[in-house]
Amino acid sequence: MSDPQQNSKQISEQVSGRGKSINLQDVHLSLTSDAGEVNILRGISLGVESGEAVGVIGPSGGGKSTMMMVIAGLERASSGTVETAGFDLTNLNEDELALFRRDNVGIVFQDFHLIPTMTALENVAVPLEFAGITDAPERARDRLDAVGLDHRLAHYPGQLSGGEQQRVALARAFAARPAILLADEPTGNLDGKTGGAVMDLL
């Protein structure tokens, strides 16, 4: 049985020095339903270089969120090439994918989740502490300040508005300093001014 920590080290070593990029080549994804096989992604090709920010637009149900899941290794493509942070995800098993995401990818889902029994500060800091980051509280405070929530550190999710909760989720992703950040409608619950500030951060 493989050692997850050793695998994580090997993955990190193989990724280091590469262009922290996204590369999709002729990606297809089909799912089986009661109605038969449904094609979700058809021949998607996309290249994103390190330092670039790319927005994907399209109609509801067009596959945007699914493509993000494929890039993060949360969905397996039926065919094609999927490289994230310079690493071919098709060669990783599920345990290796989990380690890979932890070390390289930050995700803000459209339907994000905060732990209701933790404060805003704890929701950002605790995942960092689990990852062994020693300055987790300071980093969490800095990111919450960056999204305009420095006055809400001790508030629980139930005490925050929907937009404030979304900013906590964004701060949590920013604080991890991932090589690649994937965000699904990250400003959907924010007003124009706050949304613009968040886009500047991105």
Identify the function of each model-found stretch.
Residues M1-S30:
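ABC-family P-loop ATPase nucleotide-binding domain
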